[in-house]
Design a protein with these regions (language model features):
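BZIP DNA-binding basic region
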Residues: 169-208
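Class I S-adenosyl-L-methionine-dependent methyltransferase catalytic core
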Residues: 1-176, 207-208
Length: 208
């Protein structure tokens, strides 16, 4: 759910959209930007007090990032998706944000499809009542994962679906030899999740 540093700007996802998201993901493992009451039907929630940006993310994720600072949240999602910890994700973003620099990592290297929602959204307030006014701009539901056909099929009646890319099917799940975290690679013999761990491991071997 969306939250900002200004309580008056809190905007929560409408129920009809949450049902679509649950259907696409076949259940939500994590809502990393959850409202205080944890209204989203997810297995795990990170509220403002938990600070989702300070936590590891995994499984199927629904992210409706804070309006005031979506870039850090999107980047955090991309990192954990490429590591293999996040298996599927849906991100709710204003259409105008899709071309921003902060969304480049998401749209160019991570997302596999998106749907331009056919109607403007009317969010809920902190009491979960309809705020009574439509958003001033259209929104998109951005999908990250291998089940693009499922996503596009289940959202086609709510807007215009767009396929971005198909992920390689020969991707293997591996564990980083240095940090122990899971990551995806084309070779099952891959040892490190990234250049940082590779460099640290090399320095460690030199010092021994």
């Amino acid at each position: 759910n969306t939250r900002t540093t200004d309580d008056t700007n809190e905007r929560y996802t409408p129920e009809w959209l949450l049902k679509i998201i649950e259907d696409v993901l076949d259940g939500i493992d994590l809502d990393p930007a959850a409202d205080p009451e944890r209204r989203v039907n997810a297995r795990k929630h990170y509220t403002k007090e938990d600070d989702g940006l300070d936590k590891g993310w995994s499984g199927s994720v629904f992210l409706n990032p804070p309006f005031s600072n979506s870039s850090d949240w999107v980047k955090h999602l991309c990192i954990y998706f490429h590591s293999g910890a996040v298996t599927e994700a849906l991100v709710l973003l204003p259409v105008m944000a899709l071309s921003n620099k902060s969304a480049a990592l998401l749209m160019k290297n991570t997302a596999t499809a998106f749907t331009l929602l056919g109607r403007k959204l009317s969010f809920l307030d902190r009491e979960y009542n309809d705020i009574g006014e439509m958003s001033a701009f259209p929104f998109a539901l951005v999908y990250c994962g291998n089940n693009t056909e499922n996503f596009l099929s289940k959202t086609e009646e709510y807007g215009i679906g767009c396929l971005i890319r198909t992920l390689p099917t020969n991707i293997k799940s591996c564990l980083c030899s240095y940090c122990g975290k899971p990551f995806k690679a084309k070779r099952s013999t891959a040892k490190f999740c990234g250049s940082t761990c590779r460099s640290k491991s090399h320095k460690q071997s030199i010092l021994k």
